[in-house]
Amino acid sequence: MAIGSKIIKPGGSDPDDFEKSIAQALVELEANSDLKPYLRDLHITRAREIEFGSKKAVIIYVPIPQQKVFQKIQIILVRELEKKFSGKHVVVIAERKILPKPTRKARNPLKQKRPRSRTLTAVYDAILEDLVFPAEIVGKRIRVKLDGSQLVKVHLDKNQQTTIEHKVDTFTSVYKKLTGRDVTFEFPDNYLNV
């Protein structure tokens, strides 16, 4: 199995060494695991490694049409990749594009109206949901400070606390690196005890 089939970069550029190592790990997982039927048709678009404090995290970007299939196997896939990359936290995010806000004096106005899924807010919210998968976001509070900076408090599903609580610091730093926004994650008790 060729590594080139596992990483297809937009624009046809060549992958770097780190991206090749991720693609090689995917090829090895496909060769000797029960993920083979899922991984056969899947590929990634790019990968990068970020450092925060003394830890490192791996961000893997996948095409949006393949995101649902990746999410079916994401728990097992992330666990296996974390073993291969010696305990670095692995995060899978869909490759999304932000279109600029149309201005009134645009020389070449957009042929179509900008879709909601390409706005900055929608893309940042989608990145947040991709980060915390398989947990669900059950609430969100945005606190605007007097200097204009924002602090986003994200409430996650209490049922998933044991599975992702150890990754919360990773999620915070990855989101800050990707979007420049501060975010904190909480696991509030259920308000409605039915």
UniProtKB/Swiss-Prot annotation:
One of its GO terms (molecular function) is structural constituent of ribosome. This is Small ribosomal subunit protein eS7. The keyword Amino-acid biosynthesis does not apply. One of its GO terms (biological process) is cytoplasmic translation. PROSITE patterns: RIBOSOMAL_S7E. It comes from Drosophila melanogaster (Fruit fly). GO terms for cellular component: cytosolic ribosome; cytosolic small ribosomal subunit; nucleus; small-subunit processome. It comes from the Eukaryota. It holds the Pfam family Ribosomal_S7e. Belongs to the eukaryotic ribosomal protein eS7 family. Keywords: Ribonucleoprotein, Ribosomal protein.
